[in-house]
Amino acid sequence: MLLHLSDLHFGTEREVCIQAIQQFCQQHRPEAIVVSGDLTQRARFKQFYACRQFLDSLSLPYLVVPGNHDIPLYQVWNRFFSPFVLYQAFFGRLETTLETEHFYIVGVNSIRRRYHTRGHISMEQIHETYEKLNNVPSNKIKLVVFHQPFYISPDQRDDKDCPVLGKIAL
């Protein structure tokens, strides 16, 4: 079993929800946890710290990807020049993989500093994800995790991309 969480929004989290997740994990022991973005409410140090402490306390493997709330909103300079610095300080790489007994999970960063409210992936990300999934043993369930629906910018969109997008579709 895999546990999927999203929009934890540490900084505005509700203790009753946190306790319910902890209790669920203790009772059911999922194979792994996937958190598909919005770990924090406002991308602040204390919020990332609290989220990391919480996830570590579950004592289960986990994969996280950033959400639009995980980059600074009001600190425009930081949003444009170092949007993921705190995220990376606590969770490392923006795009990771997690392999368990039954699952192979690819985390894709769909957040962009300029268009932070819309999901976006590049053709390079699509190709990289395809290559990762292409080499996974057939007995694994393959999953791709991201925060928002994908948006391909008009300058990268072309009918010739449809076969590429179709290849990666699960």
Stretch-by-stretch model annotation:
Residues 4-6, 33-38, 62-68, 109, ...:
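Active-site neighborhood of phospho(di)ester-bond hydrolases with catalytic His/Asp-centered motifs
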Residues 26-32, 118-170:
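His/acidic metal-ligating clusters that form di-metal
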Residues 1, 31-32, 61, 104, ...:
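Residues at the starts of beta-strands that form the adenosine-phosphate
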Residues 1-57, 73-74:
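N-terminal active-site segment of His-dependent metallophosphoesterases
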Residues 11-13, 41-46, 68-76, 113-117, ...:
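Active-site environment of divalent metal-dependent phosphoester hydrolases
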Residues 49-131, 136:
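Extended active-site neighborhood of metal-dependent phosphoesterases/phosphodiesterases
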Residues 3-4, 104-112, 149-155:
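Short, basic/glycine-rich phosphate-binding loops at helix/coil junctions
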Residues 17, 75-86, 159-168:
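Alpha-helical membrane-targeting segments
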